[in-house]
UniProtKB/Swiss-Prot annotation, chains A, B:
GO terms for molecular function: GTP binding; phospholactate guanylyltransferase activity. Guanylyltransferase that catalyzes the activation of (2S)-2-phospholactate (2-PL) as (2S)-lactyl-2-diphospho-5'-guanosine, via the condensation of 2-PL with GTP. It is involved in the biosynthesis of coenzyme F420, a hydride carrier cofactor. The gene is cofC. Homodimer. Pathway: Cofactor biosynthesis; coenzyme F420 biosynthesis. InterPro entries: CofC (IPR002835), Nucleotide-diphossugar_trans (IPR029044). Its EC number is 2.7.7.68. Keywords: GTP-binding, Nucleotide-binding, Nucleotidyltransferase, Transferase. Belongs to the CofC family. It catalyses: (2S)-2-phospholactate + GTP + H(+) = (2S)-lactyl-2-diphospho-5'-guanosine + diphosphate. One of its GO terms (biological process) is F420-0 metabolic process. This is 2-phospho-L-lactate guanylyltransferase. It comes from the Archaea.
């Protein structure tokens, strides 16, 4: 089965909730490293990758569409172009593997979906993308389940820690350092001086070697 | 295959990180509701449940051992008693299902493990429990992987959002309200006036109807 993976990506000033520990240049490099991890998994699973970018961007192994409208409008524009099944996958879930994506595309339902933490949606696979519309922001998982019902789609919810782990906050970096063996994003963090640290209550967080800071 | 599920449980003043929204009596009732969800999944999967309690506690459908030593010592004492495979499962992962537990106990490896968020360990299944020792607190997932290696165990890491979601903080309640259909813990939260709410940035959180507060 041939299909496209649609990956929204913000190349300029992304991941602002990480500003407390990464400056803009670093956040841009880190977001690209996570994107590489996602693209690698997508391509290994047999999909072609199309990046929906807010700004001009080049990538050797992916098509790029620059769209300046809000995220939902950009995705819905793209879905309207597709005559084959489509995967909408976020660029900030670097723990995803090709095998994980296979779990979605092998669904017997019309649609499969992976919730993100906190009510979000991290991946949607659609056999008939033109019938669907995306509604990200807020409790998008519930919104997407409702929209699927309105479309008359049968839905499989995929249970996965790796795919549900989107990286937004400092605490999320722990997951990459612990579970991200072999990932470009982990390499980036390690080369930038990040490591696991325990606070006085034994809770796990990250620390940064001050010699590696460019802030 | 016959085996025991070992569930550590603190009946008195549990879940103190929820003190900002639940008083002690409420936290005790909520912890019991989550425990009921876990016990229901455990029993439906064909296991018997043994609670390792810090204080005196009674339960109709589970054996209770009151152990006043620290958590790791209590678990390691219990593992030493077992001559059959054992599951160590936390009482604060109410999204777990019987099918999820089956994924662990059907492993072909010597051990299967489910990481929790933030470096923790939420479930361990051990075919030879007497050889193992638990080391919770801190980055316990990495510690348990190391201990398994020292024991010469082959290990399967199970990828699951539901099982990796332990409920510690106010933000975690979102997961129960969104994904916890049919759970006792969700019923408790709803009856206590909790519902999903969006903040001004569109992020999902919980709110509580002030009429339902007993604080």
């Amino acid at each position: 089965m041939y299909f496209h993976a649609l990956i929204p990506f913000k190349p300029v000033n992304p991941k602002t909730r990480l500003s407390c520990i990464l400056n803009q240049e670093e956040r841009e490099a880190f977001a690209r490293a996570m994107l590489e991890d996602v693209i690698a998994a997508v391509q290994k699973s047999g999909c072609s990758a199309t990046l929906l970018c807010t700004h001009s961007f080049k990538h050797e192994n992916a098509l790029v569409a620059v769209r300046t409208e809000p995220l939902n409008d950009a995705i819905n524009w793209a879905l309207g172009q597709f005559h084959c099944p489509a995967l909408i996958i976020m660029g900030d879930i670097p723990l995803v593997t090709a095998g994980d994506i296979q779990r979605l595309i092998r669904t017997e339902k019309d649609m499969s979906i992976v919730p993100g933490r906190g009510g979000g949606t991290n991946i949607i696979f659609l056999k008939k993308p033109r019938c669907f519309r995306a509604d990200y922001y807020g409790a998008s998982f519930l919104d997407h389940m409702r929209i699927a019902e309105e479309c008359g789609f049968s839905v499989e919810v995929i249970d996965s820690f790796r795919m549900s782990t989107d990286i937004d906050e400092k605490e999320d970096l722990v997951e990459i350092l612990i579970h991200g063996k072999g990932r470009r994003s982990r390499e980036y963090l390690e080369n930038s001086g990040f490591s696991i640290a325990l606070d006085e209550k034994g809770r796990v967080g990250v620390q940064r070697d001050p010699h590696e800071e460019a802030l």
